Amino acid sequence: MEHKLEMVTKRIDALLEAKELVLVAIDGPCTSGKTTLANALAQRYDCNVFHMDDFFLRPEQRTQERFAQVGGNVDYERFSEAVLRPLQAGEAFSYCPFDCATFTLAQPVAVAPKKLNIIEGTYCNHPYFGTPYDLKVF
């Protein structure tokens, strides 16, 4: 893990020197260390961290057709509108994370713009989002 962390931090450092806004995606299968890596990076950098687990489908969105899609358990539309677009615009915003205990949206979380933004979770690199990321870690 330490070697991977050092490789990623070198890439992030270079991006931070070259760009005003940096978006990093950490994707991979369940229990592969995505959240652990994001947390380690958050200890090193002043950054925002977003979790795809906060964007599961609400009950009314859970259809056979949706679940038949690759990654169909993720609310791509809400993540794109509520988080990705404001991030790319450098705007302050808020979003409501999905609460897995109640299957509802929780209270809004306010987000201030930061130069470095990390999105972690399975399907954060889904083709639906296009190519918004400066660095993709898998």
Residue ranges and their predicted role:
Residues A40:
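Active-site signature of alpha/beta-hydrolase-fold catalytic machinery across serine-
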